[in-house]
């Protein structure tokens, strides 16, 4: 007998729980996965019995046909697997331990994401600042500072205080993790900080 319990309802409940826990990034991944799977199935209601090996393999092929990267495919599959395993643990559906064995759930590092030094220099220095609108000047200064301050995330740059600056050293706490960071400031970055510190 087929399981008439709705997978999409379980996913939506999980998404709300994640939001309640302020895990918005994970909630977004779950929502994106659910949207992609419902779009693939061609319906808004998805039942647990539709999560089978053949459907998952077809979903994987569908995602690749849409030019999604293997890492995105893997994220969707791992999210489906996580939700499925949670439903099994809660006795909402019966489990098949090999259900996701034939779809890709790994991580590929084959795409170069870093820029070469020449490319960074071109982005940050090619057009003189005086030829740019005010908002683009500010954006380029921030990008330049983030690069020179060891790849500082924008959120950390935005939350810096003047008291974090002591001489040529920045001492601050990471916004995301709370970890203490100490960064020596190169002279070119120091010049930008002095110029735009307000």
Regions found by a protein language model. Give the residues of each.
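Basic/aromatic-enriched alpha-helical hairpins
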Residues: 1-66
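Hydrophobic (often cysteine-bearing) scaffold residues that line and stabilize catalytic clefts
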Residues: 7, 26, 30, 52, ...
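N-terminal DNA-binding recognition helix of tyrosine site-specific recombinases/integrases
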Residues: 36-39, 49, 65-99, 150-152
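Conserved hydrophobic/aromatic pocket- or pore-lining residues that grip, position, or stack substrates
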Residues: 56, 80, 123, 157
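Flexible interdomain linker/hinge and immediately adjacent N-terminus
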Residues: 57-58, 93-128
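Conserved catalytic core of the tyrosine transesterase superfamily
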Residues: 65, 114, 129-144
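Conserved tyrosine-mediated DNA breakage-rejoining catalytic core shared by Y-recombinases
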Residues: 101, 159-195
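A short, glycine-centered helix-capping/turn motif at helix boundaries
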Residues: 145-156
